[in-house]
Swiss-Prot record:
Cysteine-cysteine disulfides: 131-194, 234-288
Subunit-structure text: Heterodimer with B2M (beta-2-microglobulin). The association with B2M appears to be facilitated by the presence of the propeptide.
Name of this chain's protein: T-cell surface glycoprotein CD1e, membrane-associated
Gene name of the encoded protein: CD1E
GO molecular function: endogenous lipid antigen binding; exogenous lipid antigen binding; lipopeptide binding
Function (record text): T-cell surface glycoprotein CD1e, soluble is required for the presentation of glycolipid antigens on the cell surface. The membrane-associated form is not active.
Residues spanning the signal sequence: 1-14
Highest classification ranks of the organism: Eukaryota, Metazoa, Chordata, Craniata, Vertebrata
PANTHER family according to UniProt: MHC CLASS I-RELATED (PTHR16675), T-CELL SURFACE GLYCOPROTEIN CD1E, MEMBRANE-ASSOCIATED (PTHR16675:SF146)
GO terms under cellular component: early endosome; external side of plasma membrane; extracellular space; Golgi membrane; late endosome; lysosomal lumen
């Protein structure tokens, strides 16, 4: 079976070369990219016992997933309109057949060599391979892991055991090195096919890959880490691409206790928060600084003021509401007074009675007093509600 796979691999690579022919690689990089984009294939295989296994596979360019694998149908899932790059339908069909054979027979070969490789059930294997284009050259990689620990890597046309991986890694590398065709095929896929496919992906998905979205930044308090201490949280949300630099600062000095963690948003932007635990008396003068490619070199700096953004927004809402009520009350009093005065003149335009001229003023005063009392009651109620946040 292994020989059959090798022959298929070799035929596929040779066929791919005959279709494409020798041609210079076209290198396309986003103008704003800080680092070269990496194309990466990930394969995770779980082995519960001698007869059960499960595989998951995906492909990524940078932090954006571009492909998946439907294990039921044995087909490639193209997750973006440009996921085919500049490969022809025939090339993609051939590679789909290649992966179908690989995912079908890889578990069999692992089961067959499990005892020799000292794999103990249940176990998991992780394989990561890909490339990146740097200027007019390319760099490639392939790494294997056993139970989450580094096992081996493919470097300069040879299989190398990872430092500290022991005799298990040595045995796996010996078997892989014995089959020279495996080394030749892997080398061709990594050094020739992968860079060309990556170049086509970058060109086809240029608008999405170069998308720049500025982050929104705000500060808040986190759960208290202890008496007399504060947890300061800097929220950075909605930015793209993913690379971002966030740090709590005091003046120009970085606060080394800063802890960060990021998660993706549904719109393929990112959210990150940076936390810092400090003594309450040391919070004065702290600020959160954010650097991102979308900002054009103009960093965002938010100074810690001791109040959460929620409380600030509540105060703003209260002030706006109060101003609105006062303006509306004043306008209503004026309109009511004008209507009453006009009514008195219409009823007796020549000789207005004394009590008629005084009545509108009396009504206006009563209305003003009632509205003023209502506004005062509302203000007292809001004040009691706000006191709960202190």
């Amino acid at each position: 079976m292994l020989l059959l796979i090798l022959l298929f691999f070799k035929g596929l690579v040779c066929h791919e070369k005959s279709i494409v022919g020798p041609q210079p690689l076209g290198w396309h990089h986003p103008a704003e990219a800080e680092e070269p984009l990496i194309f990466r294939l990930l394969h995770i295989a779980s082995f519960k016992n001698h007869s059960w296994s499960h595989s998951q596979a995906s492909a990524w360019i940078g932090d954006l997933q571009t492909h998946g694998w439907n294990s039921t149908m044995g087909t490639i899932q193209f997750l973006k309109p440009w996921s085919q790059g500049d490969f022809s339908k025939e090339e993609l069909k051939n590679f789909e057949a290649l992966f179908r054979l690989y995912f079908h027979d890889f578990p069999r070969e692992v089961h067959a060599f499990a005892h020799q490789f000292q794999f103990e059930y249940p176990f998991e294997l992780q394989i990561s391979g890909g490339c990146k284009n740097v200027g007019k050259t390319s760099e490639n990689f392939l790494n294997g892991a056993y139970q989450g620990s580094d096992l081996l890597s493919f470097q300069r046309s040879s299989w190398e055991p990872s430092p500290g991986a022991g005799s298990r890694a040595q045995k796996v590398c010996e078997v892989l090195s014995y089959y020279k065709d495996i080394t030749e095929i892997v080398q061709s896929l990594l050094s020739s096919v992968c860079p060309r496919f990556l170049s086509g992906l970058i060109a086809a998905g240029k608008s999405e890959l170069e998308r720049q979205v500025k982050p929104e930044v705000w500060l808040s308090r986190g759960p208290s880490p202890g008496r007399g201490r504060l947890q300061l949280v800097c929220h950075v949300s909605g930015f793209h691409p993913k690379p971002v630099w966030v740090m709590w600062m005091k003046g120009q000095q970085e606060q080394k206790g800063t802890k960060t963690g990021d998660i993706p948003n549904a719109d393929e932007t990112w959210y990150l928060q940076a936390t810092l635990d400090v003594a309450e008396r040391e919070a004065t003068g702290l600020s959160c600084r954010v650097k991102h490619s979308s900002l054009g070199g103009h960093d965002i700096i938010i100074h810690w003021g001791g109040y959460s953004i929620l409380l600030i927004l509540m105060y703003v809402a209260v002030i706006v509401t109060l101003v609105t009520l006062i303006v509306m009350g004043s306008w209503h009093r004026k309109q009511s007074s004008n209507r009453n005065v006009l009514s008195s003149y219409i009823s007796n335009p020549t000789f207005p009675l004394e009590n008629d001229t005084q009545c509108p003023r009396s009504s206006a005063l009563q209305l003003h007093s009632a509205q003023e009392s209502w506004i005062k009651n509302r203000i007292l109620k809001w004040k009691r509600s706000l006191n709960q946040f202190w």
